[in-house]
Swiss-Prot record:
Keywords: Cell inner membrane, Cell membrane, Membrane, Transmembrane, Transmembrane helix, Transport. The keyword rRNA processing does not apply. Gene3D superfamilies: MFS general substrate transporter like domains. The gene is mhbT. Belongs to the major facilitator superfamily. Aromatic acid:H(+) symporter (AAHS) (TC 2.A.1.15) family. This is 3-hydroxybenzoate transporter MhbT. It is a multi-pass membrane protein. SUPFAM superfamilies: MFS general substrate transporter. One of its GO terms (cellular component) is plasma membrane. Coiled coil: none annotated. InterPro entries: MFS, MFS_dom, MFS_trans_sf. Uptake of 3-hydroxybenzoate (3HBA). It is found in: Cell inner membrane. GO terms for molecular function: carboxylic acid transmembrane transporter activity.
């Protein structure tokens, strides 16, 4: 007699095993290399500027092109992942950004480098959201928030590592060598992912793959053998309209739009600080080596904040936790501007900003994965990240604009604090929106993040 097993209930009843930790580690390494690239470009920018005798304004297209590619990659690869699978898309995207990062090292001029940074961004933008989706779909409800944020700490650690390593190695190997390093490592990882990274069992069920294939995938997670078993998902079947339209179906529209505002504002801050902080500090007379350590405090704070918020989000109302965190982040941003004459006080304020802003962004990614069902989850996460990348483009460009307008140091950071306040307000409104049971799809009952 065929037994029927609901996948999420099965995952919830089992401990987190070796197969799930393998997925977490693989995805951790992917986002770590993404973080490395994000930070490295900010630290090699002064060397590129000197190499081609550019102005600060000339660097804006370099930052903007990569972020435009990130946006396009997220928009394209979310629906592709929902159709062709998480594993294939992640592997392809990692190989893509590795290849074009390597080619960027040999760009003959700024125009070609800008073009290659756009192509690098396509791979980066497609990989990151799908790692969130993949990790989320492998985990039991009780551990999902904490473990997805743990996985995404790879981004903040990669950013901290990329900044410090770039600052130390640029005098030795130049900006070309940093881009070679940033290209070779993803290519090695892409090859390793082929045998190491399994496919999502939720995607396999939703795409109606043979039950024997699903049984092997699930058996590798639980350590059990499943003969004559039918696996199913306790969520609505995919509709005819496709995964994109489901983001805006009924009252889901309000939740999607509010999420997008938070993503836009949050990544605006993160990329503005990541791209321009070394230049801003250098402009204040701080040498690049010291600037790298001070800027690394932002990413280290983000790692600490992500781990802390992941635990708090699993225990308390996640929307309120993130709203409070963004509010505290806004206060710390203001403190950066008020501490321009005290390097250690500035580093402490930047560390606090990392906790409140970068840490919250990691938590926001984990939260978003719970708000959409399997058939539209990768699209929902990817499109939210794509909107966030639009904010990142605005942030990376606005840093140069504010410097050109000769904003004072404290005024500049007062302006940067405004998006953090907006994010906090939107999350408070999201708390009200998700109280309505008709607002959220059936992904929430099995989500690892609950309202209290």
């Amino acid at each position: 007699m065929t037994q029927r097993l609901e996948l999420q209930k099965l995952l919830n009843a089992a401990p987190v095993g070796a197969r799930q930790w393998r997925v977490i580690i693989c995805c951790f390494l992917v986002v770590m290399l993404d973080g490395f690239d994000t930070a490295a470009i900010g630290f090699i920018a002064p060397d590129i500027r000197s190499h081609w005798q550019l102005t600060a304004g000339d660097l804006a297209p370099l930052f903007g092109a990569g972020l435009l590619g990130l946006t396009a990659g997220a928009l394209l690869c979310g629906p592709l992942s929902d159709r062709f699978g998480r594993k294939r898309v992640i592997e392809f995207c990692v190989a893509l950004f590795g290849l074009f990062s390597l080619l960027s090292a040999f760009a003959p001029d700024l125009q070609m480098l800008v073009f290659l940074r756009f192509l690098t961004g396509l791979g980066l933008g497609g990989a990151m959201p799908n790692t969130i989706t993949m990790t989320s779909e492998y985990l039991p409800a009780r551990r999902r928030g904490a473990l997805v944020t743990l996985m995404f700490c790879g981004f903040t650690l990669g950013s901290a590592f990329g900044g410090v390593v770039s600052a130390q190695l640029v005098p030795l190997i130049g900006w070309h060598g940093i881009l070679v390093l940033g290209g070779v490592l993803p290519l090695i990882l892409a090859v390793a992912l082929v045998p190491l990274l399994p496919e999502s069992p939720r995607w396999q069920i939703r795409r109606q793959l043979p039950q024997a294939t699903i049984a092997r995938t699930v058996g590798a997670i639980t350590g059990e053998r499943y003969n004559d078993t039918h696996f199913w998902l306790d969520e609505p079947a995919a509709g005819a309209k496709g995964s994109i339209s489901q983001l805006f179906a009924g009252r889901q529209l309000a939740i999607t739009l509010m999420l997008w505002v938070v993503f836009f504002m949050s990544l605006l801050i993160i990329y503005l600080l990541s791209s321009w902080m070394p230049t801003l500090l250098n402009h204040r007379g701080i040498d690049l080596q010291h600037a790298s350590w001070v800027t690394a405090a932002f990413q280290i704070g983000g790692t600490f904040g992500a781990l802390l918020l992941g635990v708090l989000m699993d225990r308390f109302n996640p929307y309120r936790v993130l709203a409070l965190s963004y509010g505290l982040g806004a206060v710390c941003i203001v403190m950066i501007g008020l501490s321009e004459n005290g390097l250690w006080l500035m580093a402490l304020a930047i560390f606090g900003t990392g906790i409140g802003i970068s840490g919250s962004q990691v938590g926001l990614n984990a939260l978003t994965a719970t708000l959409y069902p399997t058939q539209s989850r990768a699209t929902g996460v990817s499109w939210s990240n794509a909107v966030g990348r639009c904010g990142a483009i605005v942030g990376s460009l606005s840093g140069g604009v504010m410097m050109a307008m000769n904003f004072s140091f404290d005024t500049l950071f007062f302006v940067i604090a405004v998006p953090a306040v907006v994010s906090a307000v939107m999350l408070i409104l999201l708390t009200l929106a998700v109280r309505n049971p008709t607002s959220v799809p059936a992904a929430l009952p099995s989500a690892g993040i609950v309202n209290k």
